[in-house]
Structures are given as structure tokens and as C-alpha cells.
Amino acid sequence: WGEKIFVTQPLEKEQERALLCIDRLDGKILWQRSVKYTEQERSHRTNPYCSESPATDGKRVIAVYGSAGVVCYDLKGKLLWKRDLGKIDFEWGAAASPVIHGDLVYIYRGPDPKAHLIALDKRTGKTIWQANDPAVSIDDRTDVFRRNKSREWIGSFSTPIIVTAKG
């Protein structure tokens, strides 16, 4: 945003998930904030922790850290709010980035047996609504899990997008 770049990074030795603010012109780290998370979390070797890209609206930056939660900082690194949204239990780990639109931040939490899309107030972190993924039978599936005997998972690995539907 402007001259700032925001990235997430796992600090595995420290057992932390970090958000870095980097100066776009010289590459210097302007600030770094991290969240401690010591519990074991499943993830794929090609999908390390902190795969989600942070999102900003120019006033705040929001980072999602899978099971380690969601954090919101102002652009100077002051913590505005933090939420624990529960654990994600999926063999490839979390990967969907948050999307800010209007006063809401949308976060997809899946694929997972409890997968859902959640909308939070970007100013407070309060849940505005949540839509749970429906259970799907194997015959209805079109994803790579078709051979999986689980009937509860829908495979979706992408970040939500905002579209206008029916008008």
C-alpha cells in the first residue's frame, strides 16, 4: 500500500506466525508483529504456515494464520483486534487469503470437515455472518477428493472473490 508491502512469514524456530511491513523502495523491514502458536498444525511441505497473503484497505492490514487466528493492525503496526476462529484440520493446511470489501473482511476456512465462509467487521473483528459448507455425497463431487470415502469435505483452495450476482 503506497510505499509499504505486507507479507506473512512463519517463524518456525520461535513457533510464531509473523506479519512484516516492508519498505517498497529499499526493502527494509519497517515493522514486524507476530502471534505465538505452539500447537502442531497439519500442512503440506509445499504449503508452509502463513501461506495466506494479508489484505489491506489502506487504514488497516489483516492477516490470517490458519489455526493461529486472525489479526488486524493499523499501518504503523498497532494491534487493533485479534480473533481465534478455531483450528483448521486439513492435510494441506490453510491457504485462502482474506478479502476486504466495504466494512467486511471475508475469510474462507477450509477445506475442512467444518469448512465455512465467515464475514467479520473489519473494524472490530466481530462476526457478522457465517455460511457453513454443505455436506456433499461422493457422487456429487467434482474435486480431487472424489475417491476419498469422506462425505463431509468439499475441496476448495482458493481465496474468495467479490462478484455481483443477479443484478
Regions found by a protein language model. Name each.
Residues W1-G167:
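Noncatalytic, solvent-exposed loop/strand surfaces
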